Structures are given as C-alpha cells and as structure tokens.
Amino acid sequence: MNKLIAWIEKGKPFFEKISRNIYLRAIRDGFIAAIPIILFSSIFILITYVPNVFGFTWSKTMEGILMKPYNYTMGIVGLIVAGTTAKSLTDSYNRKLDKTNQINFISTMMAAMSGFLFLAADPIKEGGFLSAFMGTKGLLTAFISAFITVIVYNFFIKRNITIKMPKEVPPNISQVFKDIFPLSAVIIIIYALDLLSRTFIHTNVANAVLKIFEPLFTAADGWIGVTLIFGAFAFFWFVGIHGPSIVEPAIAAITYANLETNLNLIQAGEHADKIITPGTQMFVATMGGTGATLVVPFMFMWLTKSKRNKAIGRASVVPTFFGVNEPILFGAPLVLNPVFFIPFIFAPIVNVWIFKFFVDVLKMNSFSIFLPWTTPGPLGIVMGTGFAFWSFVLAIVLIVVDVMIYYPFLKVYDEQILEEERGNKEVNNELKEKVSANFDTKKADAILATAGANETTTTESAPSDEEVSAKNSSNSINEQTNVLVLCAGGGTSGLLANALNKAAEEYQVPVKAAAGGYGAHMDIMKDYQLIILAPQVASNYEDIKQDTDRLGIKLAKTQGVEYINLTRDGKAALDFVQQQFEK
C-alpha cells in the first residue's frame, strides 16, 4: 500500500497543473459567483412543493406567484454564468498582460452575456425571445460564449488593436473606445456561429450542444459514471489535491441541468430520477466532507483507545458536522494515510450506489432543491429531496454503512497509534529509572508533580496584564495588519481566521483576519497586507503570487497538519503571521 501511495504522489504535479487550468478555474469560479442566486431561488421551491408531502397543494395561481422569483433567477442562470465565467477568465488573462494594458472585465461580461443570447435565445413573432435555454440547459453554451469572448479580447488588447484616444481624453471615455473593436469582433464571430447553426442544423447553438452531450449526460448517471465521478472526488483529495477543482467544472453543466430536470418532473407529477446533482455530491458522496467523513470524528471519539485519536475526534466533530472536514483530514490524518486509502475512496462510491438504488428501485425522488454545502449531510438529504419518507431511511442507512466501512481500518490505525503511545511511555519509564539511580526518586517525583500542577494552573488561568504585555512585546507587529485566509469555499479558512482574531484580541496585537473563497478574492485582496492559502488551494500559490507581488502583498501557503495546528493555537498563528513579514 505504501508503494501505491508513493506512486500516486508522483502524479501529483500533473493533477495540480490540471486543477490550475484557467478554463476549469473560470467555470468553477463562475458558478461560485452565481450561488447566491441559486440559493435564493431554491427557497421558493421549498415553499411551493414541500407542502405537497403533507397533503397540501397550492392552487395553480398561487403556484405561479410563488415560482416567479425562481423562474426569473434560476431561469436565467445560464445568462448570469456566461458573465461571471467571463469575468473569472478575464482575471486569469490579465495576470499575463502588462499592468497598464488590462482587459476590461466589465466589457467582457457584457459581451459574453450578449453573445450568449445570440446562441441560446430564439426570437418570437410578438417580439422578444424565448427563455427555454437561458437556464441550466444553456450552461454549456454559456461557457462557449465566455471563452470566445475573453480569447478574442485578449487577442486585441495584447496587440493594442484598439481605437487610441488623445491623452487629454478622460480614462473612462478612452476605455469605451478601447473596447469597441474586441466587442464588435466577439458579436460578429458569435453571430456567425448562430447563423451557421440555424442554417445547417435548423436549431440554435444551445440546443445543438445539448444534443451532442446528451449521451454523456445519460452515461454519467449510470452505475459506472457515478463510480468514476465520485471516486475521482475522493481520490484527488486523498493525494492532497482539491478534487472539486478538477471534477466539478467537468460535471457542472450536468449537475445543475439534472437539478432543474428533477424539479420539472416533480412539477409534472412524475418521478425525479436524475442522480448527479449538487445535492448528491454535497450530502451523499461527501456527507461530512470528502471521503464521507461525517461519522469518522464520532468513531475517533468513541471507538478508539488512543488518547491522541480521541482528542482529534473531539476537535473535529463540530466542523465536520457542517462539511468542513479538514481538521480530521489532516489531523488524523486521513489523506495520504495508507490505512485509510480504501475507506476514503470506497465510502463515497458506496453511498452513491445506495442512493441510486433508493431512486431507481424504491422510486424515491432525487434532489430537486439546492441547499448550502454547509448544511449537515442527513438534513441536506431530507430537505433536498423534499422531505420524502425514504430520505429519512436513506440518511440512517448511509450513516450505518459508513461506520461499517471505516471501522476495521480505524481499529488497525488505532493499534498503530497505541503502539506509538506505549513506546513513548516506555521511554519515559526508562528516563525515570536513570534519574532514580542518581537522585531520590520520591523527591524528583514531587518536583515533577509540582511543576505539572503549576503548568496546568498557568494554562487554565487567564493571562495577566503583565503576561499579555510580555507576550505582546515579543511580537513585532505594531501597525494594523489585515490578513485574508483563502480556501476553496470559505469554510476551512474561517477556522484560521477565527483563531487569529481571538488571539489578536487576547494578546492585544493589531491583526484582523477574514475568511474567503479562492476565486472570489480578486476584488478584495488589495485591502489586505497578507494572504494565507489553506492546504486545499496551496497549489495555486504561483498563480496568485503574480497578483500579490503586483500589489505589494505578502503571500504564504500552508500544509495540512501545519494548518490544523495553527487553527488550534492562536499564538502560533500570530507568530506565523509575524514570520511572513520578517522574510
């Protein structure tokens, strides 16, 4: 098994390179930017259709009123994602351009959204256009429009093919003329694609693309498809790479299209049978975080004998319950630990197999409601499937099965840690024997016991003003310092940000920390003096360094165990911040 892990680690640089691909990153960040709209729209699905489970049905008129906010937000999510994806890709291209000759992201957003309408919207005789492909059905086309837009803009801006205005003209006016050529080229190219599609295929580009990828959508929902997809999530995380950065962009269009399809099936009184949805990923495959680790901290607390394992379990329970499982991933550790390779990969796959059985055989409705990823897994299953009876059973079954999968491997690991603890105890006993040969053992024990009591008292009591002053004097941070901690979604980064803020207040150090998600940081990073990358986004260090160097901001990345230790020791976290400014 150790040889397998070593072989896997050799491929890590290749997978990290894929995870940093600017087009995959743009897709993922584009979706992240649109999540507030998706979450807002899901509220109205809950209000409209959950009462059906309890025998209450809204009238058609009332249903239409309640669903209007959904239709006017989620119904145009393709249009919105075209703009947000273009914005993210523009940021990536701008890193490679001269700082005095940047692509205007507002212009690329508008051009991408306009181009999307050409490719996805059909005109109607009465005026206006149809919106059938402006929602999740048009997501693939949204990516096409965004990519074409930014590539064309980059071609023009990089070569200075623009209308140049005199220096006396205000910058905002000059920017308008600078964008005319690339914007015009984008619209002409996309309009040409639209004309070709309607002339030779007799349909819009969005529908044509959907037809091409339809077999892939169907295959992805099959047994082999779900095995490969959700196995990949866990595999990449196991080798220390943020799996969603690679897998999510590849399946994003499928998951959100399936979510809307399931809702449409429920509205029509039919069985919602699409398996791959955001809910399947967040609450079934990664229940409690990647690796289906919801049960693992509880098992560490209650089913192990090692003091170390019990302590790790207690420290990891709360964050893992809300899907933030880095404390157990790196604290145990689970990632790159040969003992946990099989359960970490296998548990998510088995969870999805069981879920698929419930949907295909027991006819439970699949997910039709989008919920925040921090929703506890069992609650997410119940709410996301509309409070169906089988969803309660499914949640219990998954918990039991995950315990059964992890248990034998946990016992093996616990024995390993116990052996280490026994070894340390033997070393301590040997040292004590050497001491007794030269000193009065009782007297030495009394001294050690007194020292231990004093240490305990010092640890448990609040620091005095003198102690605070002494500790503060050792820290060279005298001016207000803002620290931004970045992770993939904002949950893990909150652990370190909270630890820093608490320690800064306790030791009276002028440090303020905030948590953020990588990809949503570009517009706010200028307000910080230091950016810390959590382990899950540490592979992006070289990319973001181009931005921090330009702005004169310090940048630091962390490793798994190091990061978890910093979240648990506020003073060490402050020292880490200070060290970055001493380099």
From Swiss-Prot:
Stretches that traverse the bilayer: 30-50, 64-84, 103-123, 137-157, 176-196, 222-242, 283-303, 339-359, 381-401
Q: Could you tell me one molecular function GO term of this UniProt entry?
A: kinase activity
Q: What induces it?
A: Induced by lactose, galactose and galactose-6-P. Repressed by glucose.
Q: Which cysteines are joined by disulfide bonds?
A: none
Q: Where is this region: Disordered?
A: 453-475
| Keyword Magnesium on entry | no
* PTS EIIC type-3 domain span: 8-409
Reactions mediated catalytically: lactose(out) + N(pros)-phospho-L-histidyl-[protein] = lactose 6-phosphate(in) + L-histidyl-[protein]
Q: Topology versus the membrane, per the UniProt entry?
A: Multi-pass membrane protein
Location in the cell reads: Cell membrane
Q: SUPFAM superfamilies this protein is in?
A: PTS system IIB component-like
Is this entry keyworded NAD? no
UniProt keyword terms in alphabetical order: Cell membrane, Kinase, Membrane, Phosphoprotein, Phosphotransferase system, Sugar transport, Transferase, Transmembrane, Transmembrane helix, Transport
Q: Quote the function comment for this protein.
A: The phosphoenolpyruvate-dependent sugar phosphotransferase system (sugar PTS), a major carbohydrate active transport system, catalyzes the phosphorylation of incoming sugar substrates concomitantly with their translocation across the cell membrane. The enzyme II LacEF PTS system is involved in lactose transport.
Per its record, how is this protein called by name? PTS system lactose-specific EIICB component
Name of the gene: lacE
